[in-house]
Amino acid sequence: DPFGSLDLVEVERSADGKPVSVRVAGWTVDGDTRDPLGVLVLVDGKLVGNVAADKPRPDIGMALPYSGPNHGYDAIVAVDPSSQVLCVTAGGVGAGLPFVQLGCKVVK
């Protein structure tokens, strides 16, 4: 099963305080592979971004040596001004769960 963390959620807002974009960052690995995983970004249940968790994260490589160091993700996604909740999900490989939620954050 994939696992990991949603470490950062930064909301950029318009002059009237509505969200316009969100930066998400964190990491994810799956014990069934050393390859980077795909990360889905959903807002109010709708897919708004699909990124690879392939950025350098030496801390993850040291903590989980079997995984290697390149399992970070960092992306900015556009969101609708009426957006409420952002969730990040990792896609797994091999046996186990195909998707695991890494975290959610209210962005309204």
List PLM regions with ranges.
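Basic, ligand-binding patches in group-transfer machinery
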Residues: 1-108
